[in-house]
Amino acid sequence: MAFDRVDLLPMTQLLVGPARYGGTTVPGIRIGGERLVGSRTIMRRLDELTPEPSLLPAPEDPARAQVLEIERWGDEELQDVPRAILPRAFIRKPAVMESFVGDDVNLPLPRAMLRPSLPLTARLMAIRSKTTDETARASIAGLPEQLDRVDAWIADGLLGGDRPNAADLQIGSTIRLLMAIADVHPLIAGRPAAKLTRYFPPMVGEVPAGTLPAEWQPAPARG
């Protein structure tokens, strides 16, 4: 499917999102006069426009309801983990934010002009996400149990197939982002959940080791 990608700087979606695609969060999409917000809504619409290959099991397949529930969990719960951690990391090292901007991103201003705004942007992201050091640390502490659930779904054949389904894309994108945080990476590496990143291109940015306090750092994943 042909498309045009529009890159937005962090927080600017609050200003331009309503006019462009009808919301203040990302992702958003505009198809003609139709405006859609949110990954699940967008994937359902894309499935309607391009039915094959489908992102969901057939309607008569009992696995369909399970995949939809896993997708919901990934969107509403697992996705909150990087949302809690990344702003606190960026506050500590604002310059790290620039590493997540690939060479193919169309910025409205030269990078040198944007750099002075990075510390403020990081703090605004934390306010927007309602995250504190305590919530970030708690999110890391709860991640192993969440990864256990993902590993179990892979073992049951609901995730990790040869062709990704909607839940693979929802959860795999979050896993990929979490693995870009070097202090969190060891918690995921070696798990079946880590293999869900294969559906995506390599991550551009990285939060280097030592950005988060040492007492937050997770224990290595099980062998």
Residue map of PLM features:
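Extended hydrophobic/aromatic segments used for targeting, binding, or gating
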Residues: A167-G223
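Short secondary-structure transition/capping segments
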Residues: T50-R64, D103-L114, T131-D133, P202-W216
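Generic alpha-helical structural signal
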Residues: L68, P144-D148, T197
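GST-like fold's C-terminal all-alpha helical module
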Residues: Q79-A189
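Hydrophobic, Leu/Ile/Phe/Ala-enriched alpha-helical segments that form helix-helix packing faces
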Residues: L46, L147-V150, I154, Y199-M203, ...
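GST-like domain detector, emphasizing the conserved glutathione-binding G-site
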Residues: M1-L107
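Short alpha-helical hairpin
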Residues: G17, T121-A122, P220
